[in-house]
């Protein structure tokens, strides 16, 4: 038995053990920083409202778990300042578990001075490294979406296996205001984004739909695209564009903003099976990332064992559904 296989045995034993069902809580933090002018302030207001409404009405987020920080033009709002961002994430950190999901969406403007990437806030800005430090303290699964110009460096700064990071640009040199946020929010709100028609809209489906819409936006105007969105979830910080080949997208394909199926059933046994299915699917994606680090025979044996167990669990789910 190889050392790699020996290390994998405890993981498989944990996977195959019965899982207790627990309810997933979904959190969202929508941050609008400095508006950059009246035109952008009105635009961000519309985006914030649409995103909040979509998360609550379409995806069933609890209103109290959807936090929006506003630009400086909103009277009486909680502004998107560094202090308020830190406070909001601190509150989530205290209650979020590894089974929960946190969506962070940045709306506004970003900068890159050749060394440091920042998201423009009301008052002092936060760097990509500072965002990573704060978010790494939160136990929940993370979907981080920076919709601004010059957002590309955030991909490298926030990279982590199993963490979904989306940026509106594929280069720090892309410094024009983006249309990606408009189409990202639109993709979230439309039923047609669920391409596989399984009743759940995955993060990958939203990314693909939004990216394609951005491409069409520029093509219809006969303009050269100044933005190309990237998605990274394998932790290499490279990312890939919509339609491109690459390892990224495995976790984003599994993750959705919809409530987990386990939360929709009153059958504890079925809920436990659904949760185990999600765990097995995620572990299969993790194993794919280890393919080059293990002897081929050991990797194949481990993968086949996972697939057999996933098939068994899926069959049990069908019987009890």
Predicted feature locations:
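Active-site-proximal beta-strand/loop segments in catalytic clefts of secreted hydrolases
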Residues: 31-35, 69-72, 105-109, 122-123, ...
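Boundary/activation segment at the start of structured domains
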Residues: 20-103, 110, 117-119, 251-259, ...
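Active-site-proximal C-terminal subdomain of hydrolase catalytic domains
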Residues: 49, 143-233
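A short, glycine/acidic-enriched catalytic loop
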Residues: 80, 107-138
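Second-shell loop/turn segments in exported
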Residues: 34-42, 71-79, 92, 116-122, ...
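Bacterial N-terminal signal peptides
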Residues: 6-18
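Alpha-helical, heptad-rich or low-complexity scaffold/stalk segments
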Residues: 147, 266-319
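Caspase-like cysteine protease fold
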Residues: 194-281
């Amino acid at each position: 038995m190889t050392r790699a296989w020996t290390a994998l045995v405890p993981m498989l034993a944990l996977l195959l053990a019965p899982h207790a069902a627990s309810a997933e809580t979904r959190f969202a933090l929508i941050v609008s920083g400095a508006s950059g002018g009246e035109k952008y302030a009105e635009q961000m207001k519309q985006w914030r409202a649409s995103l909040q409404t979509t998360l609550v009405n379409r995806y069933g987020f609890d209103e109290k778990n959807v936090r929006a920080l506003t630009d400086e033009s909103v009277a009486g709002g909680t502004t998107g300042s560094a202090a308020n961002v830190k406070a909001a994430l601190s509150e989530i950190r205290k209650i979020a578990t590894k089974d929960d999901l946190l969506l962070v969406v940045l709306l506004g403007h970003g900068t890159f001075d050749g060394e440091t990437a920042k998201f423009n806030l009301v008052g002092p800005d936060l760097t990509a490294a500072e965002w990573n430090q704060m978010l790494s303290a939160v136990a929940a699964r993370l979907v981080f979406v920076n919709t601004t110009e010059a957002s590309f460096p955030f991909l490298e700064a926030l990279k982590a296996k199993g963490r979904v990071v989306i940026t509106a640009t594929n280069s720090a040199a892309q410094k024009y205001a983006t249309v990606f946020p408009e189409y990202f929010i639109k993709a979230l709100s439309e039923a047609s984004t669920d391409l596989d028609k399984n009743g759940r809209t995955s993060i990958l489906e939203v990314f693909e739909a939004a990216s394609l819409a951005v491409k069409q936006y520029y093509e219809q105007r006969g303009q050269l695209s100044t933005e190309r969105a990237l998605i990274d979830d394998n932790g290499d910080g490279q990312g890939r564009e919509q339609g491109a080949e690459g390892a990224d997208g495995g976790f984003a394909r599994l993750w959705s903003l919809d409530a987990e199926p386990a939360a929709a059933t009153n059958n504890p046994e079925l809920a436990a099976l659904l949760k185990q299915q999600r765990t097995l699917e995620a572990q299969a994606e993790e194993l794919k990332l280890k393919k080059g680090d293990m002897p081929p025979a050991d990797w194949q044996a481990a993968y086949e064992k996972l697939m057999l167990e996933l098939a068994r669990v899926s069959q049990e789910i069908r019987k009890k559904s």
